[in-house]
Amino acid sequence: MIKYYNRKTKQYEIEKVAGENYLNWTYSSPIGMSFLEALIKKKAFSSIYGSFCDSKISKGKVKKFIDSFDIDILESEKKPEAFKSFNDFFTRKLTKEARPFSTNKEILISPGDGRLLVYENIDLDNLVEIKGMGYSLKELIKDEKISSKYKNGICMILRLCPTDYHRFHFVDSGVCSATSKIKGSYYSVNPIALNKVKRLFCENKREWSILKSDNFKDILYIEVGATCVGSIIQTYKENTKVNKGDEKGYFKFGGSTVVLFFEKDSVKIDEDILEQTRLGYETKVFMGESIGKK
């Protein structure tokens, strides 16, 4: 059971997990763990399932998924019958009205939909996925010079589950560097998996870049792949001016994670999010929602 905080209702809610029985079996049974290490975490498995989700055959999954998880399809630019495949639905674009955001330069917005944890005054050598399982930023991006910039800064972890909108955006205007890609495995990023696989973010496929933002200093973006996420698609133009709210990229089918690092004293995160993180709960947020101030 995964409990998260709804900041609008100020209540805790239970996450409806896509494939929960599969996740519990895979990460909690000896046979499941054997399959995980031998096949499921491999690129080939995610590539094969990704090809299925790109095919016309997978279109039949769309309506059932929408109904099972109460997806608000009215937010989508396309109607359900217009999707050509499950991935076409999964990577759907939303109407501009669906995710409004403040143009105030002092306001920091969420880069996407998901469940958010934020850590302040971070120790670069002991970043935490869950209690007792740490890793270093240097291990995560394999660049010591870049890592050192974020000493005592802020780490923001946005977990996207399969039921979420899967495009991610720029939280500020600025210029974004080219993307560095790091090969890795394809473990699930669900808390069920995080409790079982040590240093999971350092094991999974991931990509990173630097947004030289106009208002929040240099922001490190890291996109982490997961089971069945055969592709992390970057849609922005490197070393070219971007605007706040512009799309940066998207994930194909599967749960995924966007991790942002901020330099010390560059932003103050909203207290309710920090408090829930201290209590061990993620906070549900939507792309464009205000989550902090300069």
Curated annotation (Swiss-Prot):
One function term, GO molecular function aspect: phosphatidylserine decarboxylase activity
Annotated cofactor note: Binds 1 pyruvoyl group covalently per subunit.
Localisation: Cell membrane
Top-level enzyme category: lyase
Swiss-Prot/TrEMBL site (Cleavage (non-hydrolytic)) positions: 255-256
Catalytic activity entry: a 1,2-diacyl-sn-glycero-3-phospho-L-serine + H(+) = a 1,2-diacyl-sn-glycero-3-phosphoethanolamine + CO2
Protein's pathway: Phospholipid metabolism; phosphatidylethanolamine biosynthesis; phosphatidylethanolamine from CDP-diacylglycerol: step 2/2
Annotated positions of the Pyruvic acid (Ser) modification: 256
UniProt keywords, alphabetically: Cell membrane, Decarboxylase, Lipid biosynthesis, Lipid metabolism, Lyase, Membrane, Phospholipid biosynthesis, Phospholipid metabolism, Pyruvate, Zymogen
EC annotation from Swiss-Prot or TrEMBL: 4.1.1.65
Cofactors that this protein relies on: pyruvate
Membrane topology qualifier: Peripheral membrane protein
Pfam families, sorted: PS_Dcarbxylase
Assembly information from the UniProt record: Heterodimer of a large membrane-associated beta subunit and a small pyruvoyl-containing alpha subunit.
Similarity comment text for this entry: Belongs to the phosphatidylserine decarboxylase family. PSD-B subfamily. Prokaryotic type II sub-subfamily.
Functional note: Catalyzes the formation of phosphatidylethanolamine (PtdEtn) from phosphatidylserine (PtdSer).
Listed name of the protein: Phosphatidylserine decarboxylase proenzyme 1
Protein encoded by which gene: psd1
